[in-house]
């Protein structure tokens, strides 16, 4: 009988703890937030310019070659 009471109290305590933790996460108190859809989109965007695209002092050409005289990716 005592064991049953202890188990019931333990389950109630753990349930209350989970609900309290879930409430704090819902309010934005978590340490590591999941990426927003906009952040995921930024990671998936292309980071280089196609042939004919502009390039400058820091060339980011997909082909790897930048004509710095005219500022165009080759």
Curated annotation (Swiss-Prot):
One of its GO terms (molecular function) is ion channel inhibitor activity. GO terms for cellular component: extracellular region. It holds the Pfam family Conotoxin. Residues 1-22 form the signal peptide. Keywords: Cleavage on pair of basic residues, Disulfide bond, Knottin, Neurotoxin, Secreted, Signal, Toxin. It comes from the Eukaryota. Residues 23-45 form a propeptide. It is found in: Secreted. Expressed by the venom duct. Disulfide bonds join 48-62, 55-66, 61-73. The presence of a 'disulfide through disulfide knot' structurally defines this protein as a knottin. The cysteine framework is VI/VII (C-C-CC-C-C). Belongs to the conotoxin O1 superfamily. This is Conotoxin MiEr93. It comes from Conus miles (Soldier cone).
């Amino acid at each position: 009988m005592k064991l049953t009471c202890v188990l019931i109290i333990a389950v109630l305590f753990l349930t209350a703890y989970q609900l309290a933790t879930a409430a704090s996460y819902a309010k934005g108190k978590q340490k590591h937030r999941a990426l927003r859809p906009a952040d995921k989109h930024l990671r998936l965007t292309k980071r280089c310019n196609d042939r004919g695209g502009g390039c400058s002092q820091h060339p980011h050409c997909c082909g790897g070659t930048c004509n710095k005289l005219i500022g165009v990716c080759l």
